Amino acid sequence: MNINATLLGQTVAFIIFVWFCMKFVWPPLMNAIEERQKRIADGLADADRAVKDLELAQAKATDQLKDAKATANEIIEQANKRKAQIVDEAKAEADAERAKIIAQGQAEIEAERNRVKEDLRKQVATLAIAGAEKILERSIDEAAHSDIVNKLVAEL
C-alpha cells in the first residue's frame, strides 16, 4: 500500500467534509429531528390528555344523566302524589256536594210533605165541614167557628 499525495489529499478532503458536515449540516438535522421528536411527544401527550378528558367527560355525562333521571323520577313521584291528592280532594268535594244535595233534597221533600199534609188537613177540614153541614143541614159560618176548624185541623 502506497500512501501518496492523492490518498493524503482525499483524507484531508474527507476530514474537511466531515468537519463541514458537523459544523453546518449536522446541527440543523439534529434540530429537525429533535423538533420532530418533540412534536411527536407533544402529540402523544395531547392524545393521552384527550383520552383522559374524554373519560372525564363521559363520567360527568353519566353522572349528569343519573342526576337527571333521579330528578325526573322525583318530579314524577311528586306529580303522582299531587295527582292522588287532587283526586282525594275531588272525591271529598264530591262527597260533600252529594251530602249537601241529598240534605237539600230531603229538606225539600220534608217541606213538600208538610205542605201536602197541611193542604190535606185543610181539604179534610173543608170536607168535614161540608159533611157536618149536610148532616146538620145548616150552614156553619167559618169566621164564627174558626176555633172549631182550627182544633179539627190540629187534630188531623
Curated annotation (Swiss-Prot):
GO terms for molecular function: proton-transporting ATP synthase activity, rotational mechanism; proton-transporting ATPase activity, rotational mechanism. One of its GO terms (cellular component) is plasma membrane. It is found in: Cell inner membrane. Keywords: ATP synthesis, Cell inner membrane, Cell membrane, CF(0), Hydrogen ion transport, Ion transport, Membrane, Transmembrane, Transmembrane helix, Transport. The keyword DNA-binding does not apply. The keyword Secreted does not apply. Pfam families: ATP-synt_B. It is a single-pass membrane protein. It comes from the Bacteria. InterPro entries: ATP_synth_B-like_membr_sf, ATP_synth_b/b'su_bac/chlpt, ATP_synth_F0_bsu_bac, ATP_synthase_B_chain. The chain crosses the membrane at residues 13-33. F(1)F(0) ATP synthase produces ATP from ADP in the presence of a proton or sodium gradient. F-type ATPases consist of two structural domains, F(1) containing the extramembraneous catalytic core and F(0) containing the membrane proton channel, linked together by a central stalk and a peripheral stalk. During catalysis, ATP synthesis in the catalytic domain of F(1) is coupled via a rotary mechanism of the central stalk subunits to proton translocation. F-type ATPases have 2 components, F(1) - the catalytic core - and F(0) - the membrane proton channel. F(1) has five subunits: alpha(3), beta(3), gamma(1), delta(1), epsilon(1). F(0) has three main subunits: a(1), b(2) and c(10-14). The alpha and beta chains form an alternating ring which encloses part of the gamma chain. F(1) is attached to F(0) by a central stalk formed by the gamma and epsilon chains, while a peripheral stalk is formed by the delta and b chains. Belongs to the ATPase B chain family. This is ATP synthase subunit b. The gene is atpF.
